[in-house]
Curated annotation (Swiss-Prot):
Gene: OPG094
Residue positions bearing lipid (N-myristoyl glycine): 2
UniProt entry keywords in alphabetical sequence: Fusion of virus membrane with host cell membrane, Fusion of virus membrane with host membrane, Late protein, Lipoprotein, Membrane, Myristate, Signal-anchor, Transmembrane, Transmembrane helix, Viral envelope protein, Viral penetration into host cytoplasm, Virion, Virus entry into host cell
Species of origin: Vaccinia virus (strain Ankara)
Protein origin, superkingdom: Viruses
Virion surface side: 2-319
Protein name, as recorded: Entry-fusion complex protein OPG094
Length: 340
């Protein structure tokens, strides 16, 4: 029987551990990484000492601190969005902000607390109450209010809460604008109603405009509420009144009733220079000129002096030589006879 032979292998110390990417993370340098996290999304923040946990929780109150591994490895789990409507709704570019001592900033500074805005906050109706009031005040941004009203007609939120918010907004806008449609937010509302181009939107436009005061109609709606003389004059023309009435061509289209707006869209208005060579008129004829005007007065409401226009055209028209025309006619007839 042979004996056993044992070999003693050399001993070596194990190689030093190599930290993983997660272990190299530093929560104090991750402000811009943590803030955009979506609802229920984990953000790994690396090892976190016990004495820093309270500080991190205070800085990120919208997140729950979660242990993910040995050595204090941790992560933050988003649970909520704490941004307020005034800070989130009155701009379309803000996703979060940092609040400290009652002041907000887009950049983190020591001691600040993160407050985040709901994703697509303008698409969910969460801004309707705040912006409805703000857009009637003295400090509103007209572009923001115009975009918000426009977005209301294209929302993808089909939840019960979202649809109810939209209905409430339409009702409040209708009530507000029926009193005075010249309010900027109402003019935007009428503009987007017109662009929406449905039967319901057209009916709402006409309802709102018909509720306006007599002063409003006299100032802004003279196309939709013409004088008796203007209506009688319109009987002389085959084209719609909206095509030649300066009160229509100069009108704010947001304040036109639907029938006037549609008629105006049928017009083919051309500005040109006119030369009349031969003009015959009687007592029932009517002459209206709109050509040759500058851009500033191209829709001038000053009446045309028809007698002077006719006299000017006759004076400058070429003189017809009837005897010469007769001779030419006889010559043509003779040539035709000879040719046959």
């Amino acid at each position: 029987m042979g004996g056993r032979v044992s070999v003693e292998l050399p001993k070596r110390d194990p190689p030093p551990g190599v930290p993983t990417d997660e272990m190299l993370l530093n929560v104090d340098k991750m402000h811009d990484v943590i803030a955009p996290a979506k609802l229920l999304e984990y953000v790994h923040i690396g090892p976190l000492a016990k004495d820093k946990e309270d500080k991190v929780k205070k800085r990120y109150p919208e997140f729950r601190l979660v242990n993910t591994g040995p050595g204090g490895l941790s992560a933050l789990l988003r649970q909520s969005y704490n941004g307020t409507a005034p800070n989130c709704c009155r701009t379309f570019n803000r996703t979060h902000y940092w609040k400290k001592d009652g002041k907000i900033s887009d950049k983190y500074e020591e001691g600040a607390v993160l407050e985040s805005c709901w994703p697509d906050v303008h698409d969910t109706g969460k801004c309707d109450v705040d912006l409805f009031d703000w857009c009637q005040g003295d400090t509103f941004d007209r572009n923001i209010c115009h975009q918000w009203i426009g977005s209301a007609f294209n929302r993808s939120d089909r939840t019960v809460e979202g649809q109810q918010s939209l209905i409430n907004l339409y009702n409040k806008m209708q009530t507000l604008c029926s009193k005075d449609a010249s309010v900027p937010i109402c003019e935007s509302f009428l503009h987007h109603l017109r662009a929406h181009n449905t039967e319901d939107s057209k009916e709402m436009i006409d309802y709102i405009l018909r509720q306006q005061s007599a002063d409003f109609k006299q100032k802004y709606m003279r196309c939709s509420y013409p004088t008796r003389d203007k209506l009688e004059e319109s009987l002389k023309y085959a084209e719609p009144r909206e095509c030649w009435d300066p009160e229509c061509s100069n009108a704010n289209v947001n304040f036109l009733l639907t029938r006037n707006y549609n008629n105006l869209g049928l017009c083919n208005i051309v500005r040109c220079n006119t030369s009349v060579n031969n003009l015959q008129m009687d007592k029932t004829s009517s002459l209206r000129l709109s050509c040759g005007l500058s851009n500033s007065d191209r829709f001038s409401t000053v009446p045309v002096n028809r007698a002077k226009v006719v006299q000017h055209n006759i004076k400058h028209s070429f003189d017809l030589k009837l005897h010469l025309i007769s001779l030419l006619s006889l010559l043509v007839i003779w040539i035709l006879i000879v040719a046959i």
